[in-house]
C-alpha cells in the first residue's frame, strides 16, 4: 500500500484572481508562447499566428473575469470559467496543429510541455468550478438568491 509521502501544507487563501493557481500557470503559458513560440510561427508564416497569441492570453483573462463575475452573477461567472476551459482546449489544438505544420522548426519539447500544462490547468479549472458550486451550496447562497443579480455584461 502506497502512502502520500509529501507533508501536508495548506494552500494560501485566495484573495484575488492572481492567487489562483490556474491563473498563474496559464499566464506562464501565455508568456512562453508570446516570447518563444509566436515569433517562430510568424517567421514560418503560420496562418493562425495572430489568433494563436490572442487565444493564449484569453485563458488567464477569462479566469480573471470569471473570478470577479461569480459574486455578481454566479451563473455568468461559471460560464466564463467554462469559456476558459474551452480556450485551454483550443490552445492544445493550436499547439498540436503548429507542431504538425512546422515540425522541427519549432522547439518540440517546449510545445509538449505547454500542451501538458494546458491539459493540467483544464482539469484544475474543472475542479475549481466544482469547488465554487460546493461553496455556494454550503453557504446557502443559492437559496438566498445571492449572486443572481441579473448582471449584464
Q: Where are the model-predicted features located?
A:
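Amphipathic alpha-helical assembly/interaction segments
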Residues: 1-153
Amino acid at each position: 500500500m502506497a502512502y502520500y509521502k509529501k507533508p501536508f501544507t495548506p494552500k494560501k487563501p485566495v484573495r484575488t484572481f492572481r492567487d489562483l493557481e490556474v491563473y498563474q500557470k496559464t499566464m506562464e503559458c501565455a508568456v512562453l508562447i508570446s516570447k518563444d513560440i509566436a515569433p517562430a510561427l510568424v517567421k514560418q508564416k503560420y496562418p493562425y499566428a495572430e489568433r494563436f497569441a490572442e487565444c493564449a492570453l484569453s485563458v488567464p483573462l477569462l479566469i480573471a473575469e470569471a473570478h470577479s463575475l461569480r459574486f455578481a452573477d454566479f451563473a455568468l461567472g461559471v460560464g466564463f470559467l467554462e469559456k476558459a476551459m474551452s480556450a485551454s482546449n483550443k490552445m492544445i489544438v493550436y499547439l498540436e496543429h503548429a507542431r504538425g505544420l512546422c515540425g522541427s522548426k519549432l522547439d518540440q519539447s517546449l510545445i509538449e510541455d505547454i500542451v501538458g500544462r494546458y491539459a493540467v490547468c483544464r482539469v484544475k479549472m474543472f475542479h475549481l468550478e466544482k469547488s465554487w458550486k460546493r461553496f455556494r451550496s454550503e453557504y446557502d447562497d443559492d437559496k438566498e438568491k445571492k449572486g443572481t443579480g441579473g448582471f449584464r455584461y
